C-alpha cells in the first residue's frame, strides 16, 4: 500500500462497522469459531471491546447453547456456528431460540449443495435481527452462490490461517489478498459484507484486507 495525502487524524477515525441494519460493531473484528479460540469467555471479552465472538460448533448442542446464554446473560452481542451436516438442522433450531446476533454456517467449503440447503432453512426460521453469515469461500462464483442463498455476510478464506492445513492436505486454496479482491470485485451487491477469515499475522494485514475490499 502506498501512503497518500490525508486530512484525517488517527484520533478521528471511526472503526465501527454496520454488518446489517440490526448489527453494528464498534470494531471490525470477529473471533474465530474455533474450539481453541471462542467459547463464552472469549465472546464476552471481544464483545466488551466492541467486536463479536462466534461460539464454535465442536460442542454438543446443549453445551453450545449454554455458552451462548452465558454471553447473552450479560446483554452482550454474540454469534454461534453451525455446520452443514444432517444433524446441524437441530443445532440451528436450538441456537436460533437464543436470539443470536449472528448465526454462521461455518464449513471448509461453502460452495456446496448442503450449505445452500441449511442457509435456506435458517433463512426461513431466523428472526429479522439475526445476521446470517456463511463460508468459507474464495471465488466470485461462490460468493454469488451464497448471495443467491440469501446470506447477509460472506466469510472469505480457504487455507490462509497459521494452523490451517487445507492447502497442504487438499492442495486447494487461494492467496488471501487475491481471494478478497476477486470476491469483492465479482459481486455487485455492495450491501453484503465480506469477512476476511485468516491470514492476519500483523496489524498491517488488517489494512491490506480493508484495502482489498473486506469489511
Model-derived features: positions:
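An N-cap/entry alpha-helix motif that binds or orients negatively charged groups
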Residues: 1-29
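Generic structural hydrophobic/aromatic packing signal, biased to beta-strands
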Residues: 1-2, 15, 31, 53, ...
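Short FAD-binding loop at a beta-strand-to-alpha-helix junction that anchors the flavin cofactor
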Residues: 28-31, 198
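Alpha/beta enzyme core
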Residues: 37-52, 57-215
Amino acid at each position: 500500500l502506498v501512503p497518500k495525502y490525508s486530512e484525517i487524524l488517527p484520533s478521528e477515525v471511526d472503526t465501527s462497522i454496520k454488518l446489517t441494519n440490526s448489527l453494528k460493531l464498534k470494531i471490525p473484528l470477529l473471533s474465530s469459531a474455533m474450539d481453541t479460540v471462542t467459547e463464552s469467555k472469549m465472546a464476552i471479552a471481544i464483545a466488551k471491546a466492541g467486536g463479536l465472538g462466534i461460539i464454535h460448533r465442536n460442542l454438543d448442542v446443549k453445551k453450545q447453547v449454554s455458552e451462548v446464554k452465558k454471553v447473552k446473560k450479560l446483554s452482550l452481542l454474540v454469534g454461534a456456528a453451525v455446520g452443514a451436516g444432517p444433524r446441524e438442522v437441530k443445532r440451528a433450531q436450538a441456537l436460533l431460540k437464543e436470539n443470536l446476533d449472528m448465526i454462521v454456517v461455518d464449513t471448509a467449503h461453502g460452495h456446496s449443495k448442503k450449505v445452500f440447503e441449511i442457509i435456506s432453512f435458517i433463512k426461513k426460521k431466523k428472526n429479522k435481527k439475526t445476521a446470517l453469515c456463511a463460508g468459507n469461500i474464495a471465488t466470485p462464483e461462490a460468493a454469488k452462490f451464497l448471495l443467491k442463498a440469501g446470506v447477509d455476510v460472506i466469510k472469505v478464506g480457504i487455507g490462509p490461517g497459521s494452523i490451517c492445513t487445507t492447502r497442504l492436505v487438499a492442495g486447494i486454496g487461494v492467496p488471501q489478498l487475491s481471494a478478497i479482491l476477486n470476491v469483492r470485485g465479482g459481486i455487485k451487491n455492495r450491501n453484503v459484507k465480506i469477512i476476511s477469515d485468516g491470514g492476519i499475522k500483523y496489524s498491517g494485514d488488517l489494512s491490506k484486507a480493508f484495502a482489498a475490499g473486506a469489511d
